[in-house]
Amino acid sequence: MISEKIYKKVLGIGGALIVGLLFSIFITLLINSLPTIKKLGFKFLYGKTWDPVFGNFGALPFIIGTILTSVIALVISIPFSLSVSLFVGEYYRDTLMSKILETFIEILAVIPSVIFGLWGLFYLAPIVRTLQLKLSLPPTGVSIFTASLILSIMIIPYAISVSKEVIKLVPIDLKEAAFSFGATHYEVIKKIILPYAKSGVFAGILLSFGRAIGETMAVTMVIGNSNYIPKN
């Protein structure tokens, strides 16, 4: 009984430390932001001009660029991450092929972002430049689209890691019952697996979106290094 009380207190202290850490981060950001807030107000958030020489600091282009690249990357990554999750977690579950694929996914997740940035700059950007030429667009190669492609590759492993585990947790009895009524594998996935695992799949998507929002290095290397709001 005493050990159980101690265990609960230790868990409570651990939880309180996490909350306290988040609170301290927020307070630190707020305190260090006060000089900017006093000088610029909230104009910093909606200003469009970034010119340190004349003291103009508008973060709106960076905010919009972050949101655009993250949303586009998420749209690109969802079909691939969901397909691979079903492949690993359902079709080829616990097979050698799925284990090999899971290993590659884990390796992809730990590759430094600067490596993705260099690959995007020297390999993907020329491909995008060729595509822009064919579409009669300015052939820069570095753009929102290029950054979104890099981001989508970077966040796919995070969505897969969560989604495949949730898909594996779908009770076999539910699937066997559906098969016994003559349902096809596609129907089982559509009617049983995805509805059951939707919360976990959404959590994986949310995790990957957070990863995309927080990425800086790779995006900076391929987005074009321009502080203006894109018009196309």
Regions found by a protein language model. Give the residues of each.
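Transmembrane-helix boundary motif in ABC transporter permease subunits
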Residues: 73-105, 126
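Periplasmic/extracellular loop-to-transmembrane helix junction in inner-membrane transport proteins
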Residues: 2-5, 9, 31-73, 94, ...
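Residue-level signal for discrete positions within transmembrane alpha-helices
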Residues: 62, 66, 103-110, 155, ...
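Membrane-interfacial helix termini and adjacent extracytoplasmic/periplasmic loops
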Residues: 38-57, 116-153, 223-226
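Membrane-cytosol interface at the C-terminal ends of specific transmembrane alpha-helices
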Residues: 84-87, 138-180, 184-187, 192, ...
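Transmembrane alpha-helices
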Residues: 107, 115, 162-163, 179, ...
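N-terminal signal-anchor/first transmembrane alpha helix
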Residues: 1-27
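A structural signal for multi-pass alpha-helical bundles of membrane permease subunits
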Residues: 25-34, 118-128, 210
